[in-house]
């Protein structure tokens, strides 16, 4: 299991601003280790955010995204005290979900 994501969500004027720091190596499959062997690809492929059972953000990532990606997005319809859930899935079908209360 990977390290937890850092998720912050703040509501201001009816708009929720979500900031997410995802811990992931994001290996492209193109780099080589010191012995000259190719490091296998291991990267996030999809990120989904939900609030009150509705998808509020959905994105596709690939090899061009850096290690430990940061994501910032906004959506309408959330209120203080609601929970925002962020889930990523990588190319090895590893999955991580973390949540944060909207403040």
Language-model-derived ranges and their functions:
Residues 88-98:
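Short acidic/polar inter-strand loop motif in beta-rich domains
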Residues 13-15, 79-83:
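Extracellular Ig-like/FN3 beta-sandwich strand-entry sites
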Residues 22-39:
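Short amphipathic, basic-aromatic surface patches that mediate peripheral association
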Residues 72-78:
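Short, hydrophobic beta-strand segments
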Residues 10, 101-103:
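Short beta-strand edge segments in extracellular beta-sheet folds
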Residues 64-72:
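Aromatic sugar-binding surface patches on proteins
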């Amino acid at each position: 299991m990977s390290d937890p994501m850092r998720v912050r969500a703040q509501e201001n004027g009816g708009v929720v601003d979500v900031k997410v720091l995802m811990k992931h190596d994001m290996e492209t499959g193109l780099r080589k280790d010191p012995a000259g062997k190719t490091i296998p690809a291991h990267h996030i492929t999809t990120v989904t955010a939900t609030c009150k059972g509705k998808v509020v953000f959905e994105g596709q990532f690939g090899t061009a995204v850096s290690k430990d990606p940061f994501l910032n997005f906004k959506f309408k319809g959330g209120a203080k005290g609601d929970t925002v859930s962020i889930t990523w899935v990588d190319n090895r079908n590893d999955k991580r979900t973390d949540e944060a209360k909207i403040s």
